[in-house]
Structure formats: structure tokens, C-alpha cells
Amino acid sequence: MYRLTKGDDYILLIVYVDDLLYIGSTDNVTTWFEGELQKDLTLTVSSIVTQYLGLNIQEEEGTIYLNAAKYADTIAKRFALTPTTISTPYRYTAGNDKAKSAPLKPAGIRNYQRKLGCLLFAAVTCRPDLSYSASQLATYLKRPEAEHMAELDRALHYLVNTPTIGLIYYKNITTTPKLIGYVDADHAGDPDNRRSRTGYIYRLEPIGPISWQSSKQELIALSSTEAEYIALCSATKEGLYLRELLEEAKLAQLSSFSLFCNNQSAIRIANKNGFANRTKHIALRYFFVKDEIEKGRLELSYCPTSEMAADYLTKKLGKLKFEYCILLTGQSHVTSSDTPEAKGSVGNN
């Protein structure tokens, strides 16, 4: 994102190849900016944006809806995906057993990589509910097996069969925005190397979700508390970045941000008297989070696991908990006249 200032006015600009998306603080600066561009470029200007990079954008009074319905329809045609009835992007089992199946041949590997790229795009743009699956499947990008391809196909079927799930944002807000994050970790959940997984999501309240991530931790966590604290450090860094970005873009002036964690031991470690011999090897992370709390830029609070919005970013969940997390994070079923009909239905699988 770029920011251009002209006096007291400014333009926020996003560029992808030859597609520009911009907004001005006033109509005058927007008109001036378009005039400057048209001096050197031939532009097709649309004052009402309904699509951008395959995403549907629907604006109504007080709300903006974002989904990947058109993109999902394209994926269905590209990979000839047939209708199915599923409610999650993965097969839920009590444990994450290591896959044991035949490795794919070179042609299969290339197909796996193409499909995964499509899934990743949806996951990072407007489908946080796909983030865990996309991140986990990316682990096998170079040497996927038949079991991984089956899981990838299921995730794509889920995307195609739930095209109206997207993000909802509220505009014309009169209250002061607040940056609120939720962070979670799954200890030693990877069946291949027992690495833990970090998941976090940030919402600009009461507007909507603005950032999320599901990623494997670089360190081997020796306990669930340690895994949660490593995740807490990653989420704190993202919160600081978002706070500065919002201020620079003049979208919000925030003195601090809030972060909710469901591990009370990790919260105690972040406080003044939480450091101990068993946490010496994560000392830098400890002092980083502790310093942000003492400076008043981070407000760390407890959230029960039952209300942890980031839970579906770290592990496989059953149908009911998975759908509840979708609601907690601010995702919604978004429908419009331009939304292709679902190729199937969500069921109990």
C-alpha cells in the first residue's frame, strides 16, 4: 500500500500489475489524483468497485461485504470439481496421524502446487477459515503424497461449496476504533516433526477483521505454555505493525492494542514475575512482550478456550466449533446478485 499526501489531504493506493485500487480523504484530492494519472496513462475509472483481483465487493448502507464467490466458481471450472456435501475443509479426527501414502509423480506434484496456490490466495484474502488447511498443506509443497492431494481436494471442494462465506465490515462508525487480537497455539500438533502451530487474528473493532495468520513455529516448544508464549510474541509483533500502519494511513490513532490469550501461564510469564529458569531459552521473546506491556502499548488479557476466535487457525476442529469460530472472527455468509450459486451444500461431514 502506498500513501500520497497533498496538503492536508491524502490518497491510499494499492497496485497489482495494472489494477489500481485507491481512496482519497476528499473528493477533490481523488479527482486531482485521477487527473495526474491520466496525463500519462489510459485509465478505465470506476467510482463503484464491485470486483478486485477476483474478489467480490458489495457495498450496502452501513456495511461492506467481501467474498471470493466468483474466484471459487473459476476454481471449480478449472479443476472440474464436482458437488459434494462437506462442512469443514478437512477430515476431522481425534489425532493428527502422520500420512502414509504413495508419493505423487512429477505431474501430480505440479498439479498439487497449482491447486495449493489457488487455495492460498483465498486463505490470505478473505477466507481465514481456510488458513489452517492452506498452511498445513503447504508443508508438503515439494514432496506431496496421495493423502495430501486428497486433503487439498477436500479443502478446494469446501471453498467451492461455501462461496458466500466472506468478511463483513461496518462503516460510518462513530465510536473510536480499537485494535483487538486473539492468539492461540497448538502444542506439538505436527505429526511429522512435532512442531507447534501459531494462530492469530486481529479485528479493528467495531469495523471488522483485518489480519490473520496460521503458521508453524520455528522452535520446538517443550510445553503448551511455551508454545503459547511463542505465539504470543508473534501476535505482538503483528499488532505493533498494524498499529503503526493504521496511524500512518490516518485510519486510526491508537495508543495501545489488546491481545487475548487462553493460556494463563503464558500471561503470567509476560508479567514482571513470570520469568524462570525453564523459560531462559525464550528470554528474548519474554523481554520483548514484557517491554511492550510495560510501555502501555500492549494490553494482555485472558480469554477462555470456548471463546477463542483463533482456535480454528491452529488445529482441526469439529463442525460445530469450526462454525462457531467463523462467527467469532467476523466472517459471514455474503450474498448478492453477482454471487454464483453454490455447487453443493454444507452438510454434517
Regions found by a protein language model. Name each.
Residues M1, D18-L20, F33, L37, ...:
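Mobile genetic element proteins and their domesticated derivatives, centered on retroelements
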Residues S47-L167, P304, L313:
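C-terminal reverse transcriptase regions that engage the nucleic-acid substrate
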Residues L119, G181-T225:
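RNase H-like nuclease fold core
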Residues L4-L41, N56-N67, T139-A146, S265-R278:
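Catalytic palm subdomain of template-directed nucleic-acid polymerases
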Residues M1-V17, L21, V29-T31, D40-V49, ...:
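Active-site palm subdomain of RNA-directed nucleic acid polymerases
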Residues M1-T5, Y10-V17, G95-L116, I180, ...:
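Short, conserved non-catalytic motifs in the polymerase core
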Residues H157-A185, Q253:
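Structured nucleic-acid-interacting core domains from mobile-element enzymes and related host factors
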